[in-house]
Design a protein with these regions (language model features):
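Extracellular/lumenal and peripheral-membrane lipid-interaction modules
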Residues: 3-177
Length: 177
């Protein structure tokens, strides 16, 4: 009888999970600053993505800038919808099936317990998507998975977070004093 080895756990992803658990559990000390490096964030994304999007989403990668981020992944939108239990009509299914490289560029602004994520640019299979087509994709694919998501509009940060800074080196989460 062969023994099954437990799947390897990435300690960098575990580090992010521990930090988020402290913040979300209300155990963060007033004035604390939590640093999540770019390497940790990418490790966490690789572990977390299959839990959040079980089908049709592979090879996530995040490149951070000064209050910006580029996200990359291979996405099969039809499989993503199927995995979320969303029905797709035949015509739309034929248009969206198949895995495509996707790049999303966003700008991040945060202060006084609030934040806004501004979607700057989306590329699907090398084609830039914008305007009403981008709005359609957000309504059809993103919002059904995350109905409470806010894009291009401010939202309250949770768990006593004052603000979040994004730099090429990583993300700093500041807890209110």
């Amino acid at each position: 009888m062969a023994l099954m080895a437990a799947p390897a756990v990435d300690p960098r992803a575990e580090s992010v999970t521990r930090k988020l658990d402290i913040i979300q559990g209300g155990k963060a000390k007033p004035g604390a600053v939590f640093v999540i490096t770019s390497v940790e964030l990418n490790a966490w994304a690789r572990v977390k993505a299959p839990q959040v999007v079980p089908e049709g989403f592979r090879q996530p990668r995040i490149d951070l800038g000064n209050n910006t981020a580029n996200g990359y992944a291979l996405i099969d939108f039809l499989k993503v919808r199927h995995g979320a239990g969303v029905e797709t009509n035949w015509l739309l299914a034929k248009l969206i099936q198949g895995e495509k490289p996707v790049k999303v560029n966003a700008r991040f602004q945060s202060a006084k317990g609030r934040a806004t994520v501004y979607l700057q640019r989306v590329e699907i299979g090398g084609l830039v998507v914008s305007g009403t087509t981008l709005d359609f994709l957000i309504r059809t694919f993103f919002l059904p998975l995350y109905p409470n998501a806010k894009i291009n509009e401010p939202f309250e940060l949770a768990d006593r977070i004052d603000h979040i800074d994004v730099t090429p080196a990583g993300v700093r989460i500041y807890i209110k004093k």
